Amino acid sequence: MGALTWLSVVAAAASTALAMTPEKMISAPRRSEVIPNPSGEIGVFSTSQYSFEKHKRSSWWSLLDLKTGQSKILTNDSSVSEILWLGTDDSTLLYVNGTNADVPGGVELWVTQVSSFTNGYKAASLPAAFSGFKTVTTKSGDIRFVAYAQSYANGTAYNEELVEKPLSSARIYDSIYVRHWDSYLTTTFNAVFSGTLKKGNNKKGYTLDGAVKNLVSPVRNAESPYPPFGGASDYDLSPNGKWVAFKSKAPELPKANFTTAYIYLVPHDGSEKAFAINGPDSPGTPKGIKGDANSPVFSPNSEKLAYLQMKDETYEADRRVLYVYSIGSKKTIPSVAGNWDRSPDSIKWTPDGKTLIVGSEDKGRSRLFAIPATARDDFKPKNFTDGGAVSAYYFLPDRSLLVTGTAIWTNWNVYTASPAKGVIKTLASANEIDPELKGLGPSDVSEIYFKGNWTDIHAWVVYPENFDKSKKYPLAFLIHGGPQGSWADSWSSRWNPKTFADQGYVVVAPNPTGSTGFGQKLTDEIQNNWGGAPYDDLVKCWEYVNKNLPFVDTEHGIAAGASYGGFMVNWIQGNDLGRRFKALVSHDGTFVADAKISTDELWFMQREFNGTFWDARDNYRRFDPSAPEHIRQFGTPQLVIHNDKDYRLAVAEGLSLFNVLQERGVPSRFLNFPDENHWVVNPENSLVWHQQVLGWINKYSGIEKSNPGAVSLDDTIVPVVNYN
């Protein structure tokens, strides 16, 4: 492995917790999943870290010893964007160089040795910004790969750096989408490409065999991966290198109105046009199953393809069901554990091809479950991981799994687990490595259940540093988005409960009606009920905390939320619960009911409110924070955040709310980021976001006076416009 020194990444936890400040949270190292080598001895992972001193991000790749938990740096070259192990060779790596000496905007593929990373050679030059590489090594020693890039309709890869800037900035559309998430649609789209690195004779290295092939463009209107969140999990390469499977939304349906997606199968060489195994004309399509399909994964023998699919064609939070397709079969594709009341989101086959390991939300966690590949629909899977949230998992030679995950108290946790033994050994955890996270641990978090509107409801409770149950701490009441989402035992760099708590709060983060991971009925009950049962659940949560948690000061509490959580904060402002908080924070939330028609994904609103804007208008207005009877109750100081590139909920929603608050004389502030979307991800912007959010709530909760180290609005580092 060379002369590099292995460093211990598992150290004794600090005896005293250190406050999680916004600066620490944002600048803490962010590590990727750990990918093991074929022998299971070491794993490779990437790290990136932002410096507020240098105002830039650095990145590097490391190796993790899977026996000792020690690590060493493999390369500090920030242009290396991906690294893959080649075949069954423990010593050879393929890496992607994000720069291209020959083609600006392209990438290069390099082959190198673990022991001498810098002595590799260039195997291929690719003409665009390809990413998401997957490889298999054939019996002849060739490397077959797939990756994706932007594409023109004619199948040519799109390279932004080689495109001449148009003379006009006009955009013209004859159909929707016009814009999606944070981008206006153009004539280019994502596509999966295939290629082969040919093994040379007489120890000659690998070279690209011809040009890469676009596997998606022959299917009119197809796109894979599907933006904005699609990636390498939207496609797969069979272990024998013969087949490629990819997901695409239904080409024949308006994409803004339907969630329907198909899984396509195509030869790796593109010799035949891709066909949908579960499309409307496919003989094996399960009856009545028309929703989103995703996560195609080939079996080890390349004879079967597992995937997930929802039933409803307009519902993004429908229950995903596991299906296993036999390559070439015309029989109806069978479901596996089809009655399971959970919604799996990832799949891995066991090496023997007999069992499927799936990840799924489950009671505020993201857990792993083992399911026989031929299981009947009444099979009830059992989890074999417990706390935290699983991010990725890979099989080791002993058939255990190398798992990478997070938790509320750590942004990186690496351990081994198996269906038979559960969690076996923790190899590394960021809270025991990084100074920024030192002292965080499972004791920072607990959970409660309380009687909600119609069923028991779950909530997380997160404690401040040096928590003393004999003292009182103001309540920070956090409301999640979605609405079909959840507060999970996972790390977030945007809404981090521990960062709120360490200002001096006890955070309560409930999972009310509409939340995911607690059974499909709880998720579905929010339909046409946005301000009904969920609001009642939140009221009952506040009442439970007030009565049963004596260390929580509800008299000086605050409430904050984003997206649907932002809507709920706006709804709370105009209802009785709003009077129980000293301050409110609404991030990118809806305010004016009639403005919902401006969103990008129309199927979402039409499903949520049981019809179109014109046919079901009363439903859209049923829970309208901007209704006069609610506006007249506004009185709690409120921070409003809304960003220009949020095309899910247009910035006019935030401006409308701020106008009303100002006109009503309610203490209020408007925070806007012109370059951010529904989220705030730029580190410098994130720091300002945290300064404003925490400074706002600290001012009105009294934390600013009681905790000298707390964030204050006096810390504001950008000019504040005030004409008064």
Swiss-Prot record:
Could you tell me where this protein is found in the cell?
Secreted
Give the SUPFAM superfamilies listed for this entry: alpha/beta-Hydrolases, DPP6 N-terminal domain-like
Signal sequence range: 1-19
Name the top EC class: hydrolase
InterPro entries (alphabetical) = 6-blade_b-propeller_TolB-like, AB_hydrolase_fold, Peptidase_S9_cat
Q: Which residues form the active site?
A: S563, D646, H678
Pfam families this protein is in?
Peptidase_S9 (PF00326)
A GO term for molecular function: serine-type endopeptidase activity
Record GO biological process:
proteolysis
Top-rank lineage group of the source organism: Eukaryota
Glycosylated where?
N76, N97, N154, N257, N383, N453, N610
Q: Per the similarity annotation, which family is this? A: Belongs to the peptidase S9C family.
Function, as annotated, reads:
Extracellular dipeptidyl-peptidase which removes N-terminal dipeptides sequentially from polypeptides having unsubstituted N-termini.
This protein is called Probable dipeptidyl-peptidase 5
Gene name?
A: dpp5
